Amino acid sequence: MKKLFNFNKKTIVATCYGVVLFTLFFRYVKVPTGFPEVSIQTAYGIGAFFAVLLGPIGGAFVAFMGHTLSDVIQFGPPCWSWVIASGVAMYITGLASSKLKVEEGEFAIKDIIIFNIYQVVGNLLAWCLIAPGLDVVMYGENALYAFEQGVWATLPNIVSVGVIGSVLLGVYFRIRGR
């Protein structure tokens, strides 16, 4: 089994790049959904790409720090319930890295399916359970509203990761395989 994270210069630098890209995309490249405080976040496609390259711990760190920095820039204090959920979603997505052959440059239909199974599970858990559950516990949010907001966030995040993440990984694997 692959390591959860390789602590070396290359992965530390790549993680920092991931945090910066995630922050910028999370803050500036999003599409409103019509539900309050829920957008189609292109950043999760970027986060998933880094999660597969760096492993689950690197992916969780990219999303956790990127979401935190974006919230601090935009609002002041971060919404910790959603920041934690971002980290969990990318941690679970990053678990797919042990099933994919990143270094060999292979990314076939089977690999796309495996990647998307992991990201769907991660997004469902993060946005349908963790974020709304923590909203209720940490902030005293109305449970119905919190879980409805979580459900509204789930599908756009699944689509964002499914499309953007799959395309980025496909391009990376093609280039890497040469």
Ranges and model annotations:
Residues M1, F22, S97, K110-D111:
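Generic N-terminal initiation segments characterized by hydrophobic and/or small/turn-forming residues
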Residues M1-L53, I57-F61:
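Hydrophobic transmembrane alpha-helices
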Residues A14, G18-F22, G47, A51, ...:
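Alpha-helical transmembrane segments in multi-pass membrane proteins
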Residues T23-S39, F64-S97, E148:
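Interfacial aromatic-anchored transmembrane helix boundaries in multi-pass membrane proteins
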Residues V29-Q41, F75-S81, E104-R178:
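Membrane-embedded alpha-helical hairpins and interfacial helices in multi-pass inner-membrane proteins
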Residues F50, L69, A96, L134-D135:
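Broad structural signal for hydrophobic residues in well-ordered alpha-helices, predominantly aliphatic
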Residues L53, L95-K101, G170-R176:
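Structural signal for the C-terminal ends of transmembrane alpha-helices
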Residues L54, G58, V62, G66-L69, ...:
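Short, flexible micro-motifs
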